[in-house]
């Protein structure tokens, strides 16, 4: 029953929750709960690769089992009350809430717009907000470098917070485990964002989460290329050329794809000082380029959602 009824409806309701309500309170946000678990386990474990492996197994299995249990309990509650329809509705609501927690359409757009606007008005204030999007030190960034950081993060997060969770949701929905798969991905992504750094205290313990994140984002990152090309058809060849030339210049095997695609569409240079430069023949990003990037990624988000919905209908 769940497998037959839910996948398409869950996606639509999850999207509506995201657009209308945005992010849930931190105390009730599954990703925040996952992050709390990661932090507590990190404090308990020695800084070794085996610790990262143990944390990965515990957090992923915990997220999957919790999602599985909550959905089935919701469905069973209605059945025990003598109403299968009530069970369907409860499971639909719980499933949609859990799925919504794995992506962030509205939050990503609004945060990028807020910081982009603030760069022009008060660069120092914008630097204080930039860590919400990027991990680099914003202290010495120029206006152009700050805009580049926003555009880079927006395009990279398009994969991590939109394409990847939708990809795994659709992929596993045929088995009735779409929400659980999206939660598993988000668990890996959260571990990577907390542990996947090359600092002395995290290099070993973060190794497994970082590699898992690379593996799970490999296909979605490359899918971002055709999606962004369709979102900007007049620049499709520029996007393709930029990706073919610059996708491998970033330390991550995946982030270069959406960032190079965005750079090709906008014609702007993107650079993390001392680490990489994408489209070095391009111009420095200007104020309107942040708005253009938000519009571009917004269209690509809609395409990803529409494609996911269409696939769920076809696979039903």
From Swiss-Prot:
Pfam families: CobD_Cbib
InterPro entries for the chain: Cobalamin_biosynth_CobD/CbiB
GO BP term, pick one: cobalamin biosynthetic process
Transmembrane segments: 1-21, 50-70, 89-109, 165-185, 294-314
Protein's UniProt keywords contain Membrane: yes
Example GO molecular function: ABC-type vitamin B12 transporter activity
Function, in words: Converts cobyric acid to cobinamide by the addition of aminopropanol on the F carboxylic group.
Name under which the protein is recorded: Probable cobalamin biosynthesis protein CobD
């Amino acid at each position: 029953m769940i497998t037959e009824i839910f996948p398409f409806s869950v996606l639509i309701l999850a999207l509506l929750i995201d657009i209308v309500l945005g992010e849930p309170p931190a105390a009730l946000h599954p990703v925040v709960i996952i992050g709390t678990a990661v932090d507590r386990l990190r404090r308990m474990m020695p800084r070794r690769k085996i610790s990262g492996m143990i944390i990965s197994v515990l957090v992923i299995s915990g997220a999957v089992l919790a999602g599985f249990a909550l959905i089935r309990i919701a469905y069973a509650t209605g059945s025990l009350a003598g109403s299968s329809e009530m069970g369907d509705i409860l499971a639909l609501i719980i499933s949609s809430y859990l799925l919504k927690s794995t992506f962030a359409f509205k939050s990503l757009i609004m945060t990028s717009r807020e910081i982009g606007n603030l760069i022009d008005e008060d660069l120092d204030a914008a630097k204080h907000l930039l860590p919400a999007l990027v991990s680099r030190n914003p202290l010495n960034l120029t206006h152009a470098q700050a805009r580049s950081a926003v555009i880079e993060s927006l395009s990279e997060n398009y994969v991590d917070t939109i394409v990847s969770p939708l990809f795994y949701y659709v992929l596993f929905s045929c088995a009735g485990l779409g929400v659980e798969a999206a939660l598993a991905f988000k668990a890996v992504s959260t571990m990577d964002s907390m542990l996947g750094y090359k600092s002395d205290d995290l290099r070993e313990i973060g190794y497994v989460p970082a590699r898992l994140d690379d593996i799970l984002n490999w296909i979605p990152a490359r899918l971002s290329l055709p999606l962004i090309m369709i979102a900007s058809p007049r620049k499709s060849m520029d996007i393709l050329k930029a990706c073919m030339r610059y996708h491998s210049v970033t330390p991550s095997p995946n982030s270069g794809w959406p960032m190079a695609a965005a750079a090709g569409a906008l014609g702007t240079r993107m650079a993390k000082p001392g680490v990489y430069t994408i489209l070095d023949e391009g111009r420095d990003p200007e104020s309107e380029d942040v708005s253009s990037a938000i519009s571009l990624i917004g269209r690509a988000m809609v395409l990803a959602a529409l494609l996911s919905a269409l696939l769920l209908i076809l696979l039903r």
